[in-house]
Each structure stands twice: as structure tokens, then as C-alpha cells.
Amino acid sequence: MKELKLAWRYVRRHWWQYILGILALFIVDEVNTYVPRFTGEITNGLDQHTLDMGGVMGLVWKIVLIGVIIAVGRFAWRFFLFGSARSIEKELRSDLFAHLSSLSPHYYNEHKTGDLMARFINDLQAVRTLVGMNVISTFDATVMLLLVLWQMMTYVSPKLTGVAVLPLILIIFGDYFYGKVMHKRFLAKQQAFSTLTDQVQETVSGIRVIKSFVQERKELYAFAKTTLFTKEKNLGVVRLQALVMPLLDLIVGIASLLTLAYGGYLAIYGEINIGQFISFNSYVTMLVWPMMAVGECITSVSQGLASLRRIQEIFDAKPEIVDGDMVNPSIQTLKGDISIEHLSFAYPDQPTVPVLEDVSVHVKAGETLAVLGRTGSGKSTLPSLLMRLYDVTDGMITIDGHNLREIPLAALRRNIACVPQDNFLFSDTLQNNIAFGSDNKSLEAVQEAAKNACIHDNIMEFPKQYQTLVGERGVTISGGQKQRSSIARALMKDAPILLLDDALSAVDTDTERQILDNLRRLRKGRTTIIVAHRISTIQDADHILVLDEGKVEEYGTHEELLNNGKLYASLYRKQQLEKELHEEGGAAHAE
């Protein structure tokens, strides 16, 4: 099974800790089985008057020594086995995080955050139990069972042992069916928990939308349905456990009754003495734990294997964008000469719907290319393809004459600074957010980048200034402030290629003008690609590419495209009209 191979890969790293822990566990179980024997010897000695006080104290001290050995041994096996389980959990979590970080954006489009979080936390805990407590319980129950049975047969009576064990054989047959059913039910339980986690995560992330549309009651009803579904799946596991445990108690109880009846018969007719009878009943009591542990072990194994399967599914997912055979490790620095040749692209989940078709354009190092088009024209796809978040379907993109597949991924992305549409900020200080991705994290450098992005003055108005903590995804600051912070972060990187994907949509025209003036000064020597809706943002670009339904509609400078009188000119006239109407409305409002 793949799942067991995955577990073994981590367990074998700690083999010596497992050996020491199991050895300590064996010693504890071994000395434990001598306590009933010594108790029986004391009983016989006192009953037959063959023991004096010195003999009694000798046996008592042996029992005390056994207690000390058990205490030390229990500490040892807990330290080694539980410690190994925690180490495996930590290693598996780190590897899982690293693997998730390597996966392509397409994977995250198909898998919900809540489901991944459930696997990352809940399933890992089940695996820790599998390689920790379950190892202890399984070995302890097996060894204790064998040692106790050996003592019962050699010290007391093989016949009495057979009678006592006969009902317990039923447990072995029941365990097989119990394990199969429990595995299915626990898998369903974990999947239900993933759905619940995802719904909570989505609700928390979208709470502002929910409140603005007054949908709290609807979301509460939907959450109640999900909670009820999760409860039913949990009860499916609980019901099975509730059924099995009393049955185990019943079988163990029957074994105890048979022991008392047949053991009493043997004692009455002199086949065993009173000390052996008492010892045997103590041994039967010691059998209760191994028998009860069987059910717990099967439950734990079923849960652990189900969780391992869910974790294995993540490891089975392979990153779609990797350094292939074409990669040239010597390419580490780029100048920014970009050539796009007959590029066509469709997203993996919609391979028959082209987003870009036969796009060709060349941008020399240090030049600025603007990309304009209606919503859905495919303009925002270009930055993703340049950073190789996706591979092109047809055609080719080269930088400095190198096919993107020849450039190591890390080197490619290190040479590109990007301001994406969503302007994601981490739940951290503004200083750390702006310095993210930059080697120079000094406050002076951060402030300089913030000034160029026209966000410095706003930051200085905050009580904690650059140490202000932004909320998750930057929700505690405005959209314009998030956008300008993202621009500052890109400027801090100081890369030879700058990508701005609708990076000024949330700022007013005056701030836009200031930022553009700063960018004109800073982008000298840098290749800049600006994706925008507003022509005012891109009219000073060296080249303007106009896309319509994924195809090149026009290409040229601002003046050339206006003279063409096509889509670009039409968009320009509409935006100029909107600007005039807005200014007239503002003037009328002022009067």
C-alpha cells in the first residue's frame, strides 16, 4: 500500500528510537507478568506456613523492584516512541508544506483551502497517533498477550488457559470486519471535516460580502446543514465504536466467568493450588487490556491509514511547471529583452477555450510595453505566462534570446518584480510586507520604495507607522493603500523586469499621476509591462498592444493608435468623456 510506504519512509529515519522504545516496552511487560506469580507464591507460602517474615519481605522487595523497573521503563518508551511520533509529524508537515509550495496555481484552482487545511492539521494528527500511540498499543497488547498466556500455561495450567482463551478467539474474527468498516467510515468523517473547514474559511474570508448583502441567515442555515452532515459522519464512527466496545467487554467477561468456574473446579480437585488460582485470575485481568486494545488499535490504524491516503493524494500531485531537460543553470541574470512569437494559450481546466491566439510582440530591454483591452480580452494572462505560472500552449516566449524553458524557474522569477491584480498582503507589518522578496530590508530602503509608490505619507499617519500590522490579506487598510503597498514591494525588489497588472485601478487620478511620474524615472533601464484599463495609465509607453477576445487588434504608440481610429481610439474617447462628465459633476457639486 502506498500509504504504508509513505509512513515507513519516515519511521525508518527513527529506527533506533523505535528499537529502544520497544525494548523498554518489552521489559515493562515482561516484569509485569511476574507480579501475579509472586503474589501466588506469597499466598501459597502463607497458606501452607512455609514462609517466614523474611521470605515474605523478600518477595515484597522483588515486587517493589519490579515497580521501579516499570516506572523507568514507562518513561523510556514514552520518551522514545512519543518523541519519534512528534518528530515524524514535524518532518511530514514540513515536507507537505514544501510540496504544496511547489505545486502550480492550477492545483489550487481545483482544491479548496479548507480541505487542504484539514489534511494539513487533522489528518497529520491521525498519522501521528498511528506511528506513535498505535505502535505502542499494538506491540504492548501483542507482547502482553503472549507473555501472560505463557505464564498462565507454564505456571498454572494449559487446560485452564485454553478454556479462558477460547472466547477471546472470537475477537480475532470480528476485528477483520470491524477494521474494513471503520476505515470507510473514518474516511467519510475526514472528508466531511474538510468540507466543514472549507466552509468556515470561506465564510470568514467573505464576511464583508455576506454582511453587505445581508446573507448572515442564509450562511447560518448552510453552515447548520454542513454541521449536521459532519455530525452524522462522526456518529457513524462513534456508533461502531459504541457497538464494539461492549461486545469486547462481554467476551472478556465470559472468559473471566469460565476461568472462575473451571479454575475453581481444578482447585477443588487439587489440580492447581490456591496460589495458582489467585495468580490465574490476576492474569485473566491482565488479559483485559490486550483484548480491549485490539479494538482501539484497529480504530487507530483505520483512522491513520485513511489520513495517510488523504496526505498521499497531495504528494501524488506533481507540479506542472518545473525545470525540465532544456534548462540552462548558467542563466541567472536577465536584461529584459522580451520576444513573444505566435503565442496561443488556453487554461488547463478549459483547454478548448483559447485565451490568447497568435500573439506576437517584441520589447527591447529597457522599453515599456502597455497591454490594453476590454474585460476578458486575455491581457492579464500575459504576466502569468511571463513568470511561467503556466506554460504556453503554442508559440514561444523568449527573454534575452532564451526560451523561458531554458531559464531556471528561480532565476526567472528572481529577475521579475510583479504587482498582481489581487494585491495580496500578508498578516504582518507594513515594513515586512514591502520588504518581502528583497534582500535589503532596512527601514530606509522600505521608506524610499513607499515614497515612490506614494504610500509613505499614509503610513506615517498610522499610530505604529511602518510597524502597523495589516490584517489577513491586508483587510485593515484600504484598497488603494493595498495597491500602493504592492507597488512599493515590487519597487523594493529592483528587478530588471517590472510587471504591473492593473496596478493603479484603485488610486485616484492625482495619485496615479504622481506614481507614473516616479515610475518613469525608476523604470529607466528596466523592461516594464503595464496591463491596464485606463489609457491615462499607459499612453506614455513605448509600445501599446491592444487585445480583443485574445487576439491582437492593434499595435503602436499612443498617437499612432489614435490616428488609426479603431478600438483604442474608441476606448480613449469614451474615457475622456467619462473624465469630463466626472469633472463637470464635481464642479457642480462644489458650487
For the regions a protein language model found, what residue spans apply to each?
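A short amphipathic helical element positioned immediately N-terminal to and/or at the very start
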Residues: M1-W15, L116, F120
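Transmembrane helices of ABC transporter permease
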Residues: R13, Q17-E30, I66, M133-A188, ...
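Transmembrane helix-loop-helix hairpins at lipid-water interfaces of multipass membrane proteins
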Residues: Y18-A76, F80, T154-T161, G270, ...
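Hydrophobic alpha-helical transmembrane bundles that constitute the permease/transmembrane domains
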Residues: F26-R37, V68-F75, V127-L130, N134-L146, ...
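Helix-loop-helix
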Residues: T50, Q151-I169, G236-R309, I314-F315
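Short intracellular "coupling" helices and adjacent cytoplasmic loop segments at the cytosolic face
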Residues: R86, S94-A118, N122-L124, D198-A222, ...
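An intracellular "coupling" helix at the cytosolic face of ABC transporter transmembrane type-1 domains
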Residues: P105-H106, N122-V131, V135, F139, ...
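ABC-type nucleotide-binding domain
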Residues: G324, I331-E591
